[in-house]
């Protein structure tokens, strides 16, 4: 019996080390930077220095002195836009709050004069340095003082040399903002130009570093998600990717800001460490397609910005409507994506059906127990058969205590005679471990769990405080493995998920099963 336990523990521990390390510490995906499908454009605009003011050190000096703003409000967003640079630097979520008392809204973007500036700008660059392009200090004119999801707003900037820029900004009823620029050339000559965008975050690092969750810069390049840590950017100073049909952004635990360039257009994305500021990173893209605009003609280009909560059904809806490539990967479902996302939708359906997220967790756990019952039962039968042989095993150990090779030979002969495989209970256990990890991951990343009420005194299923620590996860994993090996009833699955899962401060579930 001890040999069987040792075998099970050895296999399970090896599995946790091999899978758990890769999954939870999540080494960054190596993306092939040689893009054979995209032709590199050999125009004068090839490097970051050619992008006007993109890396200017006096980034906010003029804007701090003189602000002009337009306000906006939609069903789920509110804030303002600074007309200097047409800067998005003030966005709040109307239906999400910092604390459960619902007094202070979640702020997505912050002004440049705030303690932690976080803002987004779009600009244009030309191969002709004599033609002024809109940048961070350009003062745009607005046709009105405010707008909402029902009526977009038009901004205009004229360079004084015959080139006019019209920018139409629309917000939908959720978290998507569309920006359509129209450039009209009446300069008397043809011009070449391209667009860029950048998102800058200053004086910020995540307060709680969850080792199973990525928070920070990320993007999709060549159909592959790339998550970049702040430490990587500081070490390498600059990380560059060239792709098309991709996007870049910042992700937090529950919120994100992402930029989506034109589809099917190659662009160069960059993650840049800002040395002149502490804990500051800029992510930007430069459109690699240099466009020629003849005199007396105009051109349009459209981009999208997502600024809001990572609600999976909404994100999937944007993927379908706007053809955004793999936006759902911004929700950190991890390596067990094939398990975690279906589990999320099952939980989403059940919590909607019963009107309570906690009830949804209970029902989903019961469903998992039912599905895993055949495996649990098989494991139980195998372990029970081994228990029956325990007296015989003890006698063999006493008889051959000085000859381990002979003892093992006699034990395996006994297993063969009794038609028992001592490892037959191992496979069912190994199959259940990824499901355990996936269920935990779903509950950890689901924004629906944040500030979700249950019953009675339980008004927040998330349980405020540090949600998880490495030590608590290791402890819980060991408890789970111990439970799988020691229970004599198929109900061990439910007990393992309910009674032994102490991920937060307190129980992972606000209830226990018996």
Region spans (language model):
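Generic low-complexity segments that are intrinsically disordered, proline-rich and/or Lys/Arg-biased
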Residues: 35, 41, 45, 53, ...
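Intrinsically disordered, low-complexity regulatory regions of eukaryotic regulatory proteins
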Residues: 20, 46-48, 250, 262
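Soluble non-transmembrane domains of integral membrane proteins
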Residues: 69, 73-326
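Helix-loop-helix
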Residues: 1-39, 81, 181, 195-198, ...
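Helix N-terminus capping/helix-initiation residues
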Residues: 58-59, 229, 356
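Short amphipathic alpha-helical "recognition" segments used for binding
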Residues: 44, 115-116, 242-245, 483, ...
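Intrinsic-disorder/low-complexity peptide segments enriched for small residues
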Residues: 5, 52-53, 63, 75, ...
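Juxtamembrane extramembrane loops of integral membrane proteins
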Residues: 14, 23-106
């Amino acid at each position: 019996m001890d040999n069987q336990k040792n075998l099970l523990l050895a296999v399970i521990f090896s599995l946790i080390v091999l899978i758990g390390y890769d999954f939870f510490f999540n080494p960054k995906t190596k993306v092939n930077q040689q893009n054979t499908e995209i032709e590199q454009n050999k125009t004068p605009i090839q490097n970051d220095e050619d992008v006007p003011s993109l890396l200017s050190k006096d980034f906010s000096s003029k804007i701090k002195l003189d602000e002009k703003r337009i306000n906006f409000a939609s069903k789920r967003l509110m804030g303002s836009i600074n007309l200097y640079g047409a800067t998005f630097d003030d966005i709040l979520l109307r239906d999400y709050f910092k604390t459960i008392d619902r007094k202070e809204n979640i702020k997505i973007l912050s002004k440049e004069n705030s303690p932690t500036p976080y803002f987004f700008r779009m600009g244009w660059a030309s191969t002709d340095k004599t033609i002024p392009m809109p940048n961070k200090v350009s003062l745009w004119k607005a046709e009105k003082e405010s707008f909402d999801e029902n009526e977009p707003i038009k901004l205009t900037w004229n360079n004084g040399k015959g080139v006019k820029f019209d920018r139409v900004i629309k917000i939908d009823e959720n978290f998507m903002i569309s920006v359509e620029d129209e450039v009209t050339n009446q300069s008397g000559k043809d011009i070449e130009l391209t667009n860029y965008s950048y998102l800058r975050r200053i004086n910020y690092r995540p307060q709680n570093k969850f080792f199973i969750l990525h928070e920070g810069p990320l993007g999709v390049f060549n159909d592959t998600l790339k998550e970049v840590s702040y430490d990587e950017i500081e070490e390498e100073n600059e990380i560059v990717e060239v792709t098309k049909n991709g996007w870049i952004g910042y992700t937090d635990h529950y919120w994100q800001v992402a930029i989506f360039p034109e589809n099917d257009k190659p662009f160069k994305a960059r993650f840049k460490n800002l040395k002149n500021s502490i804990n500051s990173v800029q992510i930007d893209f430069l459109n690699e397609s240099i466009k020629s605009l003849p005199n007396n003609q105009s051109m349009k280009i459209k981009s999208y910005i997502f600024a809001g909560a990572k609600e999976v059904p909404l994100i999937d809806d944007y993927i379908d409507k706007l053809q955004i490539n793999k936006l759902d990967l911004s929700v950190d479902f991890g390596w067990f994506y094939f398990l975690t996302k279906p589990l999320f939708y099952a939980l989403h359906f059940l919590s909607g059906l019963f009107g309570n997220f906690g009830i949804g967790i209970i029902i989903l756990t019961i469903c998992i127990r039912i599905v895993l019952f055949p495996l649990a039962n098989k494991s139980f039968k195998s372990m029970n058969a081994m228990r029956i042989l325990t007296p015989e095993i003890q006698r063999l150990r006493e008889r051959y205590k000085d000859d381990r090779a002979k003892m093992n030979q006699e034990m395996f002969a006994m297993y063969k005679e009794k038609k028992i495989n001592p490892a037959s209970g191992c496979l069912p256990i190994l199959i259940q471990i990824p499901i355990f990890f996936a269920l935990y991951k779903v509950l950890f990343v689901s924004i629906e769990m944040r500030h979700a009420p249950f019953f009675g005194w339980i008004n927040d299923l998330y349980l405020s405080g540090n949600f998880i620590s490495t030590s608590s996860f290791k402890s819980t994993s060991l408890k789970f493995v111990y439970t799988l090996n020691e229970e004599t009833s198929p109900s061990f699955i439910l007990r393992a998920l309910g009674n032994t899962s102490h991920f937060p401060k307190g129980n992972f579930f606000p209830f226990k099963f018996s």
